[in-house]
């Protein structure tokens, strides 16, 4: 992380991986304002498993987009790993998305590059992040999810379940 990003740390959030305080998201068009999220308070402790469930239009995707750095809150406080996302610059968001969070779309086809092999798909984010020993790390990850034998397979040679495991 950059020195700039390290200075955007909330003092009392060491206990929490995610903390939302009175979080608000308003989408605006020329004529209409839609309140997608209003006054959300949420604490997720480190190591805690959390499921976000709710009716259609209840703000689940809005919250996840903000946690994933794909959208910015309109008001309130949002901390991830002790960092205050409301103070992020565009550069901070880029670094955050590369090093802190991952976002997996429901449609796996959007998460993978079809003409690359399984191992190349795993290596791609590491390449963009400048990591060394990418091939070794990619092979270890494929082994962990039981896909080492499919390392040289392209997506059209793999099942839907294998796509999910690969993502």
Regions inferred by a protein language model and the residue ranges of each:
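The feature captures the beta-strand-to-loop junction immediately N-terminal to the Walker
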Residues: 53-55
């Amino acid at each position: 992380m950059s020195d700039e990003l390290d200075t955007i740390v909330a003092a009392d959030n060491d206990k929490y991986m995610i903390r939302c305080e009175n979080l608000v998201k308003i989408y605006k068009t020329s004529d209409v304002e839609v309140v997608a999220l209003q006054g959300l308070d949420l604490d997720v402790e480190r190591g805690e498993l959390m499921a976000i469930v709710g009716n259609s239009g209840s703000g689940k995707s809005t919250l996840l987009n903000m946690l994933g750095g794909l959208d910015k809150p309109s008001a309130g406080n949002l901390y991830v790993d002790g960092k205050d996302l409301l103070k992020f610059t565009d550069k901070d968001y880029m670094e955050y998305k590369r090093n802190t969070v991952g976002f997996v779309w429901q449609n796996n086809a959007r998460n993978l590059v079809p003409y690359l092999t399984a191992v190349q798909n795993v290596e791609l984010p590491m390449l963009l992040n400048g990591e060394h020993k990418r091939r070794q790390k990619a092979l270890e990850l494929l082994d962990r999810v039981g896909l080492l034998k499919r390392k040289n397979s392209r997506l059209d040679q793999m099942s839907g379940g294998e796509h999910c495991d690969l993502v």
